[in-house]
Amino acid sequence: MKIMRKNHPMLKIINHSFIDLPTPSNISSWWNFGSLLGICLMIQILTGLFLAMHYTSDTATAFSSVVHICRDVNYGWLIRYLHANGASMFFICLFIHVGRGIYYGSYVLSETWNIGIILLLTTMATAFVGYVLPWGQMSLWGATVITNLLSAIPYIGNTLVEWIWGGFSVDKATLTRFFAFHFILPFIITAFVLVHLLFLHETGSNNPSGLNSDSDKIPFHPYYTIKDLLGILLLLMTLIILALFFPDALGDPDNYTPANPLNTPAHIKPEWYFLFAYAILRSIPNKLGGVLALILSILILATFPLLNTSKQHGLIFRPISQTIYWTFVANLLVLTWIGGQPVEYPFTMIGQIASIFYFTIIIILMPVSNTIENNIMKF
């Protein structure tokens, strides 16, 4: 078996990627989230495939088909809730994965980092079009509000919105194409994941100390396969508890009302994992400015390799940068909370302050703290 694993053309690739892969001996549990994201993606594709077998992408029957899945299909309710809550677990793992990358300076592996940003954007797009499919109130109005933002683009905005809608409002054509996008995007994500891994294995993994670990590597299997297995079991346990006991904890009650274009919900808001970006969008009174801030809130991650001036790798030995990092995390949680609140005082004011702080921390405070720490350490 060992000879076959090392010589067979197909098994050799798998062997070099998952079995005999040289891995730093000191990587912590924060490095588990890459494999957890892979498991989340597999769960989403499998449950999504079974849901697609029973779903109809027509405005007249979409809501009823989801009800049919929950009531009449064998374990349809379980598949639906695993898929809906699986998306939340996916984003929790995704945010922690990005957060770990920032904390431990993984952004210096710029190719892997940039593919990761593309993956984040593609996953957000997939989740957005997926939220429209049940055709509840929040599905319709969320799709209307978010797609309407494109009308802020000068000259071509309105034409672009109508082109995406396939008409003059979010209707049957929009739902059909969103279903097509939601079906194909996970496979595009899978392709990007392979490219992400390809670039990662070119350079090798980062590690908590931030030092070169070429002199101290161990094989990925069995050491990290066992470690990942524990993470996978904890993830599955959390997901199953969520799907069985609290299936609607992270959803919106408005989405249990069939879509009605004549009745606007009191508070239109996206799923919880988009609330931080939604708060940044709402904090700017100008429509185009809000859209640009929304896009920049994600694309600003690409500036990390450019703004990094520290002579040390990661934040593990840098207390000033650590303080700024955890302030940034707290600020993100504030933005997430504000995104779910109504547009009124004091929430608008808090949102504006938190949005300014979000960009200030990344563009000004982090590079300044790098320079201060370099001077203290006399680098």
Curated annotation (Swiss-Prot):
GO cellular component: mitochondrial inner membrane; respiratory chain complex III
CDD domains found in the cross-reference section: cytochrome_b_C, Cytochrome_b_N
Name used for this protein in its record: Cytochrome b
Note: Heme 1 (or BL or b562) is low-potential and absorbs at about 562 nm, and heme 2 (or BH or b566) is high-potential and absorbs at about 566 nm.
Parts of the chain that traverse the membrane: 33-53, 77-98, 113-133, 178-198, 226-246, 288-308, 320-340, 347-367
GO biological process terms, semicolon-separated: mitochondrial electron transport, ubiquinol to cytochrome c
Note describing how the cofactor binds: Binds 2 heme b groups non-covalently.
Organism: Thalpomys cerradensis
GO molecular function, one term: metal ion binding
Cofactor: heme b
Subcellular compartments: Mitochondrion inner membrane
Membrane topology field: Multi-pass membrane protein
InterPro entries: Cyt_b/b6_C, Cyt_b/b6_C_sf, Cyt_b/b6_N, Cytb/b6-like_sf, Cytochrome_b, Cytochrome_b_C_euk/bac, Cytochrome_b_N_euk/bac, Di-haem_cyt_TM
Protein's UniProt keywords contain Mitochondrion: yes
